[in-house]
Amino acid sequence: MDLSNLKPAEGATQAGQRLGRGEGSGRGGHSSTRGTKGQSSRSGSGTRPIWFEGGQTPLFQRVPKHGFNNAPFRTDYAIANVKRLQRLLDEEVLDEDEPVTPEVLADLGVVRTANRVKILGDGDLFDALEVKAHAFSESARQKIKQAGGSVTVVDQ
């Protein structure tokens, strides 16, 4: 005997009841074990959606709609602060002579991705740096220029 010859023991299985196949079948005819009338006696009467309120006007249709959500269209930036650039200079990870680009920041782990990097002005910068990024806050722009560095906005 092998797996291809296995079958259930005699009498171990039964065929399912066939509903709605006439009075003589014992499970058919008038209402086919569904009771009388009502939603659950109709065909296609499965579970209703969780927001279904029994025919009452649903909540999302009753409350007023107003406002606007710009989330699908907003521009998300990976951010880096000026103090982080200064710390990298202090730790001699960055070189003052090399330009700081989004790719350099991504390689150093300052930002996760080199796409859309914005430099913010938290902290202080004491060394002149050539910084290239997709956007700068006004305070970051001022601090980089005060330290003798340059700011370049790169395109996508």
UniProtKB/Swiss-Prot annotation:
It holds the Pfam family Ribosomal_L27A. This is Large ribosomal subunit protein uL15. HAMAP family: Ribosomal_uL15 (MF_01341). PANTHER family: 50S RIBOSOMAL PROTEIN L15 (PTHR12934), LARGE RIBOSOMAL SUBUNIT PROTEIN UL15M (PTHR12934:SF11). One of its GO terms (biological process) is translation. One of its GO terms (molecular function) is rRNA binding. It comes from Salinibacter ruber (strain DSM 13855 / M31). Keywords: Ribonucleoprotein, Ribosomal protein, RNA-binding, rRNA-binding. Part of the 50S ribosomal subunit. Gene3D superfamilies: 3.100.10.10. It comes from the Bacteria. Belongs to the universal ribosomal protein uL15 family. One of its GO terms (cellular component) is cytosolic large ribosomal subunit. Binds to the 23S rRNA. InterPro entries: Ribosomal_uL15, Ribosomal_uL15/eL18, Ribosomal_uL15/eL18_sf, Ribosomal_uL15_bac-type, Ribosomal_uL15_CS. Residues 1-56 are annotated as: Disordered.
